[in-house]
């Protein structure tokens, strides 16, 4: 959420494993039913691109009791190395858990992520550890807020200038350039990240 008066942004992070009603679509993008499934599957249950983004936004809105959502911005993780390096790298402080991704990620050390290391930082999770997605979600918040802070340091219009070469390749959004640049003018309160109440449980084998 964005407070236009204080210029502060607060993040609501929703677990990809959240079980909810997912709309299903045929090959033309027309809705034909619903299933109870993980939130992350909504994109795949549509036809891709902007239509899948719209479907995901619609599902999230219903999950949040029809809370208004002003737009969507979807980034393919495959584009992280290029976008990251276009900014000259993104610096984050490492935790003890991050050493599992790369031994160079020492706890307490600030590391400027470059190339594939940036992608691995936001994508990695140990599939042998139950609920390892929680740690990945925490890293993703740290990374995205650091990326926006870096973009802001380059000037008011840096964020859109940064991503514009990658719009067709890695990004789907219904936001225009001015709206995207406005996002980089906010201070994001990473110590106040909200999430949905719930419990992560193992599914049936």
Positions of PLM-derived features:
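Non-catalytic, solvent-exposed segments at the cell envelope interface
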Residues: 1-205
